[in-house]
């Protein structure tokens, strides 16, 4: 008779709206700050990834690498074009990262209930991986159209409004939806789910696992947390980068009368056959630098949760 109240209390905690809302706020604020800081590198990375599929960039005008891209963007499009699409990126990234973090902690409660880290280490480790992957996949289903629009806006290289393909976020979504329907906004969704599970599983799972092995995970020094986060984001980014390249290429097809790829597998095969394996990792170094922003998100998220006095369960 006396076991029922604790059970109800546990159920209440599992679906605590207040805690969930604070998770959204903490993750969103941390993400907005970090993405604005690394926006120029983000745009360079996108251009290097998709220039072979862009009709706006002729073969002879393609960027030779990160440095060439960094030099030519301000010269050809203006200095502030480094932040082109950044507002859309912040709008997209707020719900994406916030939902990732919020769902991650909820999935951790579901997957790790009753798991003892000391006695069931591998089950605990796999639960961390599963919670990270499930959080990323769930969030992607909700915000994919915004991610799609962010990509198309980021690789739009016209100098003035008359040369641009899209006027802004709303214009991009409306034009693609009008020409291809809602399905056009989900171009590349399948490979995105595969890539996001690989990335998020290692991103969240490895970070939480390594921090959990420290003597006092809740009192980890900032520099130690940042170093762990930096290593995790770099490894996760490289591991999932080929999936990201293919999904970006698939996104470039929406709204086009003639399509370059028949599907995800065809895209993988054609990139390998016509451009070589290195093309799957084009812009990867920029992504490593951009990963600094991802590392900051992880660390800032923990600090913001501490500020709001949110219990970081399992850490």
Curated annotation (Swiss-Prot):
Residues 50-86, 143-190, 244-283 are mitochondrial matrix. Residues 247-252 are annotated as: Important for transport activity. A motif (Nucleotide carrier signature motif) lies at residues 247-252. Residues 1-19, 112-121, 212-222, 302-315 are mitochondrial intermembrane. The lineage of its organism: Eukaryota, Metazoa, Chordata, Craniata, Vertebrata. It is a multi-pass membrane protein. GO terms for molecular function: ATP:ADP antiporter activity. Belongs to the mitochondrial carrier (TC 2.A.29) family. It comes from Macaca fascicularis. The keyword Membrane applies. Monomer. GO terms for cellular component: membrane; mitochondrial inner membrane; mitochondrial permeability transition pore complex; motile cilium; plasma membrane. It is found in: Mitochondrion inner membrane; Membrane; Cell projection, Cilium, Flagellum membrane. This is ADP/ATP translocase 4. Its main location: mitochondrion.
